[in-house]
Swiss-Prot record:
Subcellular location: Nucleus
Domain named RRM: residues: 4-83
UniProt GO BP: mRNA cis splicing, via spliceosome
SMART domains: RRM (SM00360)
Organism ancestry: Eukaryota, Fungi, Dikarya, Ascomycota, Taphrinomycotina
Chief subcellular location: nucleus
Keywords: mRNA processing, mRNA splicing, Nucleus, Ribonucleoprotein, RNA-binding
Purpose of the protein: Involved in pre-mRNA splicing. This protein is associated with snRNP U2. It binds stem loop IV of U2 snRNA.
Species in which this protein is naturally found: Schizosaccharomyces pombe (strain 972 / ATCC 24843) (Fission yeast)
Pfam families documented for this protein: RRM_1
Source organism superkingdom: Eukaryota
InterPro entries, per database record: Nucleotide-bd_a/b_plait_sf, RBD_domain_sf, RRM_dom
Name listed for the protein in its UniProt record: Probable U2 small nuclear ribonucleoprotein B''
Length: 111
């Protein structure tokens, strides 16, 4: 299970894909940094989206706050996604490739 990515379903499938992505971004970004939203209009993926957060704790807060939230006239269902998002895998790989010394310096700069 991936704790950065939320699987959202029972979305109104009559909404334009770009409008849906924008509305989901506006709603979920109030809980933390959203790095990606995947909302496809294929028959298999209609009414579903994946919202990817940078921080797993932000995803947990958003899931708790928005579970059963009425969104475009339908009650959203939210759970953790089963697989890791490609964007999170890329971020982790970039951090790992920098080496431990560079990571320590970056972390020290943040403090």
């Amino acid at each position: 299970m991936n704790q950065n990515t939320l699987y959202v379903n029972n979305l109104n499938d009559k909404i334009n894909k770009n409008d849906l992505r924008t509305a989901l971004y506006m709603l979920f970004s109030t809980y933390g940094t959203v790095v990606d939203i995947v909302a496809l209009k294929t028959p298999k993926m209609r009414g579903q989206a994946h919202v990817v957060f940078f921080d797993p704790s932000a995803a947990a807060i958003a899931m708790k706050a928005l579970k059963n939230f009425i969104f475009f006239g339908k009650e959203m269902k939210i759970q953790y996604a089963h697989s890791k998002s490609k964007i999170i895998e890329r971020i982790v790989a970039e951090n790992d490739s920098r080496g431990p010394l560079k990571r320590l310096r970056d972390e020290a700069d943040l403090e």
